[in-house]
């Protein structure tokens, strides 16, 4: 879900509650995903605490649809249902967890073969740099 969809967020939160924002979108998009053959859906949730109700419930709903579900968290979740994978940063500072989570998310998107302009630009920049400056 794009964060520029504020009217969607507002209307769903008003009608169904904040905890259902993502699950309602998944319900709407499910037919789009299932119409295409050989499409595998992976839902990645990001939560500093690991216990954000709207994130955990969306991952649970995605898992119920047969989609892969992964939680990247700053702290170990105490409420994550079985069958949902968790990658826990487990650090004291939320700032550190947020930075690491963001880097992992972009790398995962890139490694799965999706376009990630920020990473692609950095790879091109480093490949043009003199060998001694490449990191």
Annotate each predicted stretch with a short phrase.
Residues 1-126, 130:
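Glycine-rich phosphate-binding loops that contact phosphosugars or nucleotide phosphates
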Residues 131-135:
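Glycine-rich phosphate/diphosphate-binding loops and the adjacent beta-loop-alpha structural elements
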């Amino acid at each position: 879900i794009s964060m520029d969809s504020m009217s969607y967020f507002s209307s769903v939160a008003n009608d169904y509650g904040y905890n259902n924002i993502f699950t309602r979108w998944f319900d709407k998009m499910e037919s789009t995903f299932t119409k295409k053959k050989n499409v595998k859906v992976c839902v990645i949730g990001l939560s500093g605490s690991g216990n954000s109700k709207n994130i955990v419930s969306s991952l649970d709903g995605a898992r119920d649809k047969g989609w892969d579900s992964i939680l990247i968290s700053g702290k170990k979740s105490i409420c994550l249902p079985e069958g949902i994978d968790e990658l826990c940063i487990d650090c004291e500072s939320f700032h550190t967890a947020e930075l690491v989570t963001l880097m992992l998310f972009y790398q995962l998107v890139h490694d799965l073969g999706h376009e990630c302009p920020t990473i692609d630009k950095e790879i091109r920049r480093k490949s043009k740099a003199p060998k001694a400056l490449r990191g």
